[in-house]
Structures are given as C-alpha cells and as structure tokens.
C-alpha cells in the first residue's frame, strides 16, 4: 500500500505542480483517477486527505528511498519525512536510530535535490524550533524553500517553519482580499505574511524570536514584496495584545500552544472577521468553540491538515465572529 493525496479533478494540475515543487510526488507510480478525484502518489506525507491505496507503478525509477535499504532496516525506516529546500528532515524510532547513517545515505541517493539529512529530535524552547542534528552532508541548517511561487530562506534550526502547511498557506491566500488588516500572531519566518502582503493585505507579524524578525525581513526582500504594508513586532503576543487594533483576519499558527491565546485574541477580531486556529488535537476529540468563546463565534470550517501521531492530528479551525453554516472536510 502506498500513501496518496486525494484531490478533486479540478485541482489535479495545481496539486501536481505543488507536489513537484516540494518534491513530494512519487514519480515511481502513476496518478489514479477515482470517482471525480485524482490520487497522487507520495514520497512523503503532505497536508490534505491522505489515503492508502495500491500503487500503480510507472516506468520511471521509484524514488522511495526505503527500496534501497536492506529488508531488515526497510521495515523499521520511516515512510514520511519533510523536505525543507535541500534538507531532508526525518524522525527515527529507538529501533531505527542505530541505522541512521544508512537511512540518511539512502535518502540522499534517492532524492537528487537533497544534499543534507537532519534528524528531528522534537520541538524545543520558547521559540518552538526543531531540535535538529545533521546526520549527512554539511552541518548547515540554512536553505531556500520554494512554495506557491515564493522563496523562503532561513535557518530551520533557529526559526519555526513547517513545509507541510504549503497548501494551507495557499488556501488562506486565496480567501484573503486586498486591503484586509491581518494579524499573524506567531509569524516565524513569515511565510503567511509574505504571501498575504504581496496581495495587498496590511500585515502585523508578531514573534518573540529575534531570528524570526531577521529571516522575515530577508524573505520580504527576497520575494520583492514591499514592506509598506507590513510591520514586524518582536515580542510575545500576550505582552502587546491589549495595545493592538482590531483585524479582519487573525492567524494563530502555534499548534502546540494556540488555545491559551484564543480568548484574548478573539477580542481583536472585527465583526465578520475570521481566526484561523491551528491546533494539535486528539483524533477522537471534537472541538467545540463555545467551550472557549462566546455565542457570537462559530467554527465555520475545519479539516485535518496532516496526521501528527497515531492518536492526534494537526487541524485548522476557521472561526467566524458572526453566524454561518458549519462545514467540515478533509479535502
């Protein structure tokens, strides 16, 4: 069985371009059409509706790195990994850790655009950055990541950035309108903010990590986006929230710790404004917005962005300060 990304046929080509851009498309297998949907074969998991399906082999050489491993190691090597620019980022179990060098070399030889492999040891510190150890290639965590027509350069060991949110960033970009006032409350290297500012939205980006400010400014310049409608505030959001104005849209991309800030930030939302809340939640748990906010708020959209563990998922919740019809989808 092979992991596939399921998308409507109408979005097949733009999805293919995205998967090729982030090197997630498994060219060893063919896409499968099924009841108005296209199933794209994956090298590694991305956000969206992921299903396991028998792959349809292509005549091209497969880039599944595990096929180059001895059978004993192949069984315990991770299927999924992230790619940030030219860096592959993997998590290893205790069982597979002793084979890290062999696994890393197989990743390098199977992905020609990857020149470094980093071991992900979890998230550390108040700046929620990855605890990384380079296990193959030059010990340099700076790379340039391309997505949705933008380039983001940063040190992935010093600034928060999730390659798996590329389609989510595109979704929010498509929803936004020129002139909107937007608060990016946990900005990191500002991938949301750069794209939205390029569309003419007025952005206030906030992050307490000084490295985030450095790389955010760099990414605005790198993408030729004017800073005339962009302000970066290097601070903890709780220290400045009372002084902030109101916004049409608020981004809360702090999956491990968003909920404690939801109530205070909700007071900074205009009528008919939207909060995009990213939160890791137990798969069996149902999110009830009234457990956190008043009756004037409603969750109008939710979906799984990607699995986080066997028991939990990263989900996005669009919270409207008004009334609307609730919809839920994994597409």
Regions found by a protein language model. Name each.
Residues 1-331:
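SAM-dependent transferase fold signal centered on methyltransferase-like domains
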């Amino acid at each position: 069985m092979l992991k596939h990304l399921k998308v409507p046929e109408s979005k097949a080509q733009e999805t293919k371009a995205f998967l090729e851009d982030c090197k997630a498309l498994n060219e060893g297998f063919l896409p499968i059409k099924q009841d108005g949907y296209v199933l794209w074969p994956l090298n590694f998991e991305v956000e969206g509706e992921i299903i396991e399906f028998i792959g349809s082999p292509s005549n091209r050489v497969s880039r599944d790195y595990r096929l180059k491993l001895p059978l004993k190691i192949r069984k315990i090597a991770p299927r999924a990994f992230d790619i940030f620019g030219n860096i592959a980022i993997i998590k290893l179990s205790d069982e597979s850790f002793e084979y890290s060098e062999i696994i890393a070399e197989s990743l390098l030889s199977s992905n020609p655009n990857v020149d470094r492999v980093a071991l992900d040891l979890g998230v550390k510190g108040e700046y929620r950055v990855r605890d990384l150890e380079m296990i193959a290639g030059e010990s340099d965590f700076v790379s340039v990541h391309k997505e949705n027509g933008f380039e983001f350069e940063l040190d992935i060991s010093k600034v928060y950035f999730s390659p798996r949110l590329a389609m989510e960033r595109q979704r929010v970009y498509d929803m936004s309108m020129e002139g909107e006032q937007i608060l990016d409350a946990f900005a990191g290297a500002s991938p949301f903010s750069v794209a939205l500012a390029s569309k003419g939205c007025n952005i206030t980006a906030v992050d307490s990590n000084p490295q985030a400010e450095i790389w955010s400014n760099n990414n605005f310049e790198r993408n030729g986006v004017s800073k005339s409608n962009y302000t970066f505030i290097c601070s903890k959001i709780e220290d400045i929230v009372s002084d902030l104005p109101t916004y049409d849209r608020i981004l809360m991309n702090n999956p491990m710790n968003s909920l404690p800030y939801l109530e205070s930030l909700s007071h900074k939302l205009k009528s008919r404004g939207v909060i995009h809340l990213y939160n890791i939640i137990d798969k069996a748990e149902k999110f009830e917005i009234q457990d956190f906010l008043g009756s004037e708020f409603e969750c109008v959209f939710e979906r799984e962005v990607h699995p986080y563990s066997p028991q939990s998922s990263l989900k996005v919740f669009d919270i409207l300060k008004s009334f609307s019809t609730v919809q839920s989808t994994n597409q």
